[in-house]
């Protein structure tokens, strides 16, 4: 199982991204689900449509319809955790998309600290709730 950030998804879906083939190969080999925050999904959809066009967006929507990707639910408990993260790491200006992605990877809900992202700045600075560090893909392969 991998929690996905916008930058990693863009590499996977945008044919113009140089990292795309390696990311797609890694994701195709992944046995577990890909989990996406609804905030990441909204951010990603906008960027994908404006950068790669309608065909790329249709691929995303068809993947979502066939359960290739799982869209996580944002709960009131997540909102409280996000507020604490944003406050604790105020200097990073995390935003809700990154904060919720970190919560999904740090909570027991999905049992993973693996995140598909190229955002080293935010995801290296923040520590999972259970301690340790996030495993950032593809950097930590």
Language-model-detected regions and their locations in the chain:
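Short, well-structured N-terminal submotif of metal-dependent ribonuclease cores
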Residues: 1-36, 49-62, 129-130, 141
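A general alpha-helix detector
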Residues: 8-9, 43-44, 81
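Structured helix-beta-strand junction loops
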Residues: 29-31, 67, 92
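Active-site neighborhoods of divalent-metal-dependent phosphate/nucleic-acid chemistry enzymes
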Residues: 71-118
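Acidic, PIN/NYN-like endoribonuclease modules and their adjacent C-terminal/linker elements
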Residues: 102, 108-141
């Amino acid at each position: 199982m991998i929690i996905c950030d916008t930058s990693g998804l863009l590499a996977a879906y945008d044919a113009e991204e140089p990292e795309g083939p390696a990311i797609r190969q890694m994701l195709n080999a992944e046995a577990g689900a890909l989990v996406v925050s609804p905030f990441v999904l909204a951010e990603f959809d906008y960027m994908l449509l404006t950068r790669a066009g309608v065909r790329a967006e249709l691929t995303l929507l068809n993947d979502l319809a066939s359960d290739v990707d799982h869209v996580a639910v944002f709960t009131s408990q997540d909102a409280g955790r996000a507020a604490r993260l944003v406050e604790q790491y105020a200097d990073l200006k995390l935003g809700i998309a990154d904060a919720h992605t970190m919560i999904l990877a740090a909570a027991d809900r999905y049992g993973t600290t693996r995140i598909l992202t190229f955002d080293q700045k935010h995801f290296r600075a923040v520590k999972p709730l259970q301690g340790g560090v996030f495993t950032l893909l593809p950097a930590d392969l």
